[in-house]
Amino acid sequence: PIVSWINNLEFKKAAEKLEFLVVEDIYSDTETARYCDLLLPSANGLKKEGVLINTERRLSKLNPVLEKKENELTDYDIMLGIGKALGMGKLLDKWKTPRDAFETLKACTKGMPCDITGVNYDMLKDSRGVQWPFRAGEELKEDERRLFEDNKYYTPSGKAKFIYEDVAPVPYEQSEEYPYLFNTGRGTVGQW
């Protein structure tokens, strides 16, 4: 969204140049929504079900606490509908519920660094989350695990590889009138 983008003026300029902008949001009056050609109204998070994966690698279960109204759609419903509208129906046959989608995701991770084949949908319901990798057959012994504690990295050499980018200059100068710079937490690579 524009409000939290690293440089929202650049975002606005880019949005104005787009041929077509789709925004999915629970509000229709956001600054970003004002630029869109198509607004997909979404149910708020209190009505959603599914599994979230954060940047700490933690899978958490999102349980709805409010009922959806008739014709109200969640993110999942919207993305599933778009997929079907694009002719992907056969590929999405197994995706009837968020649980089904999770099972499909889980199968895709087998043997990968992010393997979650040991995570079961029900184990996430009342937990504080499970960090990947968590392979089938592993036992969850602790609440938090650190990735690469064993010094084994997913690189050809097995060693850590650091990738960095040059720090961009601050787009605004501090002044007496505006002595503080605001950091949204977003960077050019991701958000942490």
Task: List each model region and its residues.
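Short amphipathic alpha-helical surface patches that mediate protein-protein
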Residues: 87, 99-106
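Short coil/turn segments at secondary-structure boundaries
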Residues: 93-98, 117-120
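Non-catalytic, well-ordered alpha-helical segments in soluble enzyme domains
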Residues: 76-93
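Generic alpha-helical secondary structure signal
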Residues: 9, 13, 77, 96-99
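A cross-kingdom feature strongest in bacterial/archaeal respiratory oxidoreductases
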Residues: 1-70, 103-192
